[in-house]
Amino acid sequence: MPIDTQALFDEKDYTGTYPYVADGVIGPYTPANRDHPAYSAPAPGVRYTSSAYKVSNLRPYLGYYYACQNYMILASEPAVLRMDNIREEMFFPTIQDLYEEGKGWVITPASKILTMNLLEGQPRLIDETLKIVEWNVRFDILPEVQVYRKDTNQVYPITDFDTRGLIRDGAIHGTLRTQFTNEWRPVQFIPENSLS
């Protein structure tokens, strides 16, 4: 059944920074340093309710994706996330490899590494029947973020670990796409360098 486009869209302009929410706290947060990775990083909580097909409900859905990306860079613990495709979607898979192998981790002064900016006032409905929507976004990266490698005992800028070629001008640019239904559907990030 096609989506009711009048119900989906509203008159608001959602362009701008989306608030970062990660309040799933299991203990006092301890930032990483050369001696250890971050402890008790705040995890994102699900804020999505699928009761109605409205942009106001879509935004928290995409916000959860954003928070999961940030959490994976900060803590690399996918088990606490309700996002099945996070491993395929990770912006920095080589950092995940360092975490898993115990060879390194991210060092940052803050628990928020990414800032998501919505670049359009409203999403675009690209398939009315399948309810597929897209929204152009930019993820700004905190410039102070570094990656510590135990094997070299050195820190490196996070940009050195951009094996997917996503970063341009200190940010990751692209499009978030999802099928917006009353069930939890994966969000897919489409990098600007793969858009035609």
Residue ranges and their predicted role:
Residues G24-I113:
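Core segments of small alpha/beta cavity-forming domains
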Residues K112-P123:
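Long, compositionally biased
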